[in-house]
Amino acid sequence: MIWWFIVGASFFFAFILIAKDTRTTKKNLPPGPPRLPIIGNLHQLGSKPQRSLFKLSEKYGSLMSLKFGNVSAVVASTPETVKDVLKTFDAECCSRPYMTYPARVTYNFNDLAFSPYSKYWREVRKMTVIELYTAKRVKSFQNVRQEEVASFVDFIKQHASLEKTVNMKQKLVKLSGSVICKVGFGISLEWSKLANTYEEVIQGTMEVVGRFAAADYFPIIGRIIDRITGLHSKCEKVFKEMDSFFDQSIKHHLEDTNIKDDIIGLLLKMEKGETGLGEFQLTRNHTKGILLNVLIAGVDTSGHTVTWVMTHLIKNPRVMKKAQAEVREVIKNKDDITEEDIERLEYLKMVIKETLRINPLVPLLIPREASKYIKIGGYDIPKKTWIYVNIWAVQRNPNVWKDPEVFIPERFMHSEIDYKGVDFELLPFGSGRRMCPGMGLGMALVHLTLINLLYRFDWKLPEGMNIEDVDLEESYGLVCPKKVPLQLIPVLTQWT
């Protein structure tokens, strides 16, 4: 019975939309693939939309029109079109469309990442840039990073002495979570409510906010579809677990007067009016929404990036050997390894860039929404159009990168291209007003962790595995980590 209702309602709304379209002036929209009635191009997305959209762009062009239910969208897939979206028309393309499940997990867009462009968003952005993610504040947390990495190294040593396998993805995500919990929440992950479900909840949140949800593309009927598929219940589950964690962290902070200089402390001062946020008075939901961004951005930037780097290194022994030789030559017998050592490790920096090129953690940026009519590349982009930026396509474009599927760190030798949002051939953290503000905090931990792993240990695969068996498939969500866990055996060395 419910399916007859779904079909009937879908045709009703399709009739309204078609009638509306016939009354509008014909526009010079970008080319795109044929679409089906009602669902448009949703059937062409597949399980990994960034890959499917890349293939479609090879046929239909660098700026491509699509229809997702009742939503009109365009996809930018080359450095030139992406530059138009993120730089030339950054102000006009800076807002966000309403998305059902991001609205829920961000406490009705009280965050930075999903909030529409507004005075509130501008004030939060300014606060994060000036207060949370300055170079000075990132450096102030260096002791926490060093303590947590030292503890992680001790764990690896124990496994090396026993020749035991380490689940690198699991342990690296936990490492980044431990750092973020201390610098952001003043609480130990080990004693928090997320201690046993941390990775599951973080990845679940990313899947929920990154899915192409029916509720976003079909009025009324979409919510019913999401309840049938289980997306709605999954969203509620991860939201409640995350909310409970935030409550615990805030309560702990309020009860322990010894906790100082963390991110919750700053936000609680704003709640009390001790520190300003322009004309806005922060509420508890504002605090939680901002904390969600801090937690997610820090974990995904560092934990999953290091996992991908180690995956490519173990799969490319030549690169591993070269990277370790450089690290050991530069560090030598120095006991006090610091993040600043990365500045002398030119080849390791190339390895990190190449990893971020092949495996951008957010291959399809959060959609933007055109706040007014604009023209890109001679094509009309009507107001309210959803704009997707396919970073995956940009960074695997054969016209930009020779042998784009091959891991070649040397391609960055004598190259000025960097991942900091200026070069549109390499944008793993985005660019413009919506660029990830937590990049510096996350990458500081990436550098410190990798230097320690490569300096102190050699690495090998478990018995019976060859490098051909190392899988490079990614999971899909807003963030795309390695799908199959990376299992490695650490080996003690003279530098351990």
Swiss-Prot record:
Protein EC: 1.14.-.-
Membrane-related topology note: Single-pass membrane protein
Principal localisation: membrane
InterPro entries (alphabetical): Cyt_P450 (IPR001128), Cyt_P450_CS (IPR017972), Cyt_P450_E_grp-I (IPR002401), Cyt_P450_sf (IPR036396)
SUPFAM superfamilies in the cross-refs: Cytochrome P450
Listed GO MF terms: heme binding; iron ion binding; monooxygenase activity; oxidoreductase activity, acting on paired donors, with incorporation or reduction of molecular oxygen
GO cellular component: membrane
Residues of the signal peptide: none
Requisite cofactors: heme
Pfam families associated with the record: p450
Keywords: Heme, Iron, Membrane, Metal-binding, Monooxygenase, Oxidoreductase, Transmembrane, Transmembrane helix
Cell location: Membrane
Membrane-spanning intervals of the chain: 1-21
Positions that bind heme: C436
Family of this protein: Belongs to the cytochrome P450 family.
PANTHER family to which the protein is assigned, alphabetical: CYTOCHROME P450 71A9-LIKE ISOFORM X1, CYTOCHROME P450 FAMILY 71 PROTEIN
Name of the protein this chain belongs to: Cytochrome P450 71B14
Natural source organism: Arabidopsis thaliana (Mouse-ear cress)
